[in-house]
Amino acid sequence: MKSWVSIVLICTLFYSFRYKMDERVVAQAYIERYSVLAVNEMRRSGVPASIKLAQAMVESNAGRSVLALESNNHFGIKCKSYWKGQSYYHKDDDLDAKGKLMESCFRAYADIDASFKDHSDFLRSSAKYASLFNLDITDYKSWAYGLKECGYATDRSYSLKLIRTIEEYQLYRYDTYLSSEFDLPAYQALTSQIVPIQSTID
């Protein structure tokens, strides 16, 4: 009996380890693909590259969510009354009069670049996020907590998820590339060398 329990435990640990490794491979590929875009948007808009990448990874499950795959929306941004672009309807957290989940209107984009750009413009153009741009661009923790306080997400642990992601994948390194002139080969080398580490958040 003990040997059977041991086998089950070993198998469980193995598959758990394998799953975590697979998740990290997917996450790292996502970072390598979109980090330059995030840095360019940081230089254009002032939104930290670490925050943008972390939000995109959390909101889109590193590009694998239905919303990301079907509408190129990597930040979970809903339509709002003033949105004039394409839309995609998907059940999220909006409830109807009977308290049942109803389809929410999300913004849809022609490509992922447009999603990253609109995320910057969405934050820059809204008065409720204005205070974020008074923060130091390298202060990712204050940005993470500020986004939650400003109402970006309803998830109570949203800030901690962003911070964990930033620290595990060392996304804060990208916030140092604010200058319009930087060594692109060195930057790309940095991207390929980043190895996931343990977050300081429990």
Residue positions per predicted region:
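Catalytic cores of secreted/periplasmic lytic hydrolases that degrade extracellular macromolecules
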Residues: 2-3, 13-202
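Conserved S-adenosyl-L-methionine
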Residues: 6
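Localized chelating/binding microdomains
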Residues: 9
